[in-house]
Amino acid sequence: TACQNHMTHVSQRDMKSTLALAGSNRDELERVLEHYQDDPQKLAAARYLIADMKDNYYLVSDGIDSVHAALVTTSLQEGFLERNRRDRWMAYRYEGTAEKIYDAQTVSAEYLIENIDLAFESWQRYPWGKYYDFEDFCNYLLPYKIGDEKPDNWRRIYTEKFAPVLDSLY
C-alpha cells in the first residue's frame, strides 16, 4: 500500500542510523529483517520498529534498579502502589547518575520477532483490529515499549493473562 511504501522509504534512512548505532548488536536486528523477508507486511513492520528504535533507550543505575525492584514486588503482591511508594518513585531523581543504554545495542532478534508476531496476532484476532489500518497498527499496537523503561516481555505476559477475558468479550 501507499502507506507501507511511504513508511519503508522513511524507515530506510532511520534504519541505517539505528543499524549504525547498534554496533555489535547489528546482527540481531538484521536477523529480524531476514526472518520476515517472505512476509511483506511483517517486514514493513520490522523496518518501522527498527527505524523507530534509534532514539529508544533505558537507564541503569543502582538507585533505579532498587526502586524498580520494590515497585515490581509491591505491584505483584498488592495489585496497586501505595501513595507513599508512588510518591517516592516520582520524586526519585536519577539525572547524571544513570547510564543510558540504547535498545538497538541490546535487544535480541527473538525479542523483536515475538513482539511483532504477538502484535499482529492481537491486531488480526480481535474485531476492533479492522478499525486500524497498517499505519495505526505501527504507531499504536506494534511498539514494544512506551517510555524509557527497559524492554521486557510485557506483551507475552498481558496476552497470556488477559486473552481469556478478551476472548469472552468478543
Protein language model regions, located:
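N-terminal accessory/pre-domain segments preceding catalytic cores
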Residues: 4-170
